[in-house]
């Protein structure tokens, strides 16, 4: 069986999940991996056959997605070419982790596509909802990477097709200690913004990991480090 596993390349969450899932799929068939977007830092322990521009979101530095940069990064002609040229007819099973090229290629060519992401869980009728409705955000979740069947991930399992988050083996096998610090990682917010929000918590020690810096520094009760998978996991395992 030939399997296409398509990953959203905005941030490291989707790729982190794939690191655990792909080896299991490889036991069931021949797996090709696709990644679209460019805002991910984790190393892939498996070959990536398709590296596409896609329709990725661009993180800002003030929290959330930078709408302007995301719009400027959008290349609709290239996206259309990628969708139409992706040879999904060669695959028996297509899985999309909120990845738009594979999902829309399946839509156009009338192929089943399985959604496997935390995003599909948020659309479930039983999913916890915010007090105010974000109509545009909800529309994006529905239309960005449409799939024919869905399996979601959420902190609470409220349906048979919704599962608790997948935690990487590297994290699960870490020795847990308590060095007294609080570990912080907010990829869509730069370190200066985080420091501003946490400055009044002077009784606590923080280890902050930021993708927006190249060298570490210390400021009062804050230690700030450039993003490193191993260092972050170690910090998290030894946090308070």
Residues covered by each model-derived region:
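Short, polar loop motifs at secondary-structure junctions
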Residues: 35-41, 97-101, 150-158, 208-216
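Donor-nucleotide binding loops and adjacent catalytic segments primarily
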Residues: 167-171, 175-238
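Structural motif
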Residues: 2, 92-93, 181, 240
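Conserved nucleotide-sugar donor-binding subdomain of glycosyltransferases
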Residues: 64-93, 100-101
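A donor-sugar binding/catalytic signature common to diverse glycosyltransferases
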Residues: 93-101, 105, 115-116, 231-240
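Active-site-proximal region of nucleotide-activated glycan assembly enzymes
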Residues: 112-163
């Amino acid at each position: 069986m030939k399997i296409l596993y398509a990953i959203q390349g905005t941030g490291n969450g989707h790729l982190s999940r794939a690191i655990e899932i792909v080896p299991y799929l490889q036991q069931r068939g021949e797996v090709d991996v696709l990644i679209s977007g460019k805002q991910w830092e984790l190393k892939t322990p498996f070959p990536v056959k398709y590296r596409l521009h896609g329709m990725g979101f661009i993180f800002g530095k003030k929290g959330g997605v930078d709408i302007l940069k995301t719009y400027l990064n959008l290349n609709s002609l290239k996206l259309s070419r990628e969708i139409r040229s992706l040879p999904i007819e060669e695959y028996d099973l297509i899985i999309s982790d909120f990845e738009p090229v594979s999902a829309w290629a399946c839509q156009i060519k009338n192929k089943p596509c399985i959604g496997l992401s935390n995003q599909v869980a948020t659309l479930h009728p039983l999913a916890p909802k915010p007090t105010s409705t974000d109509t545009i955000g909800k529309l994006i979740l529905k239309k960005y990477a449409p799939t024919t069947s869905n399996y979601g991930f959420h902190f609470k399992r409220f349906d048979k097709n919704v599962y608790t988050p997948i935690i990487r083996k590297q994290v699960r096998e870490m020795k847990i200690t308590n060095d007294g610090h609080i570990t912080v990682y907010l990829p869509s917010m730069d370190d200066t913004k985080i420091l501003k929000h946490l400055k009044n918590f002077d009784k606590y020690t923080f280890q902050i990991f930021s993708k927006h810096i190249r060298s570490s520094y210390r400021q009062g009760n804050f230690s700030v480090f450039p993003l490193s998978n191993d260092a972050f996991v170690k910090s998290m395992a030894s946090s308070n």
